């Protein structure tokens, strides 16, 4: 029998298997916590670097990325208060500033747009990336089509290539311009 941990999630006492993340527990209970760098599929490990899944943990000064944080016994987690939702909204707004408008995007149905909708964000109040700095679609290789205008530098595609497909043919470059 596996070990369990009891904690409070949005006012409800829940029991989770040790090793599960807050995001996994919430998702299993039908709660939707926005996420971008985490893919809930076999072989994909969460990294927590996009910060789109932030939640508040009682007694902690900073918000926590729910996709990498494991609940502890007696922990009180809040996913839907003003602080957590405001932080997630801010993250999405900052990311949208570096992307082309949805109408000009190569992939109008991208997960990023779904998460923007979920957070109630249709546009960013931050300065847009200059048109000349938005990467073009690269379909120069017969086996890969790279759409960097949708890139938020979360590393999901690199992890998928390296850890799931085990071929390590893509990487990150030019971050932090």
Task: Label the model's feature ranges.
Residues 1-3:
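Basic/polar N-terminal segments that are highly enriched at the extreme N-terminus
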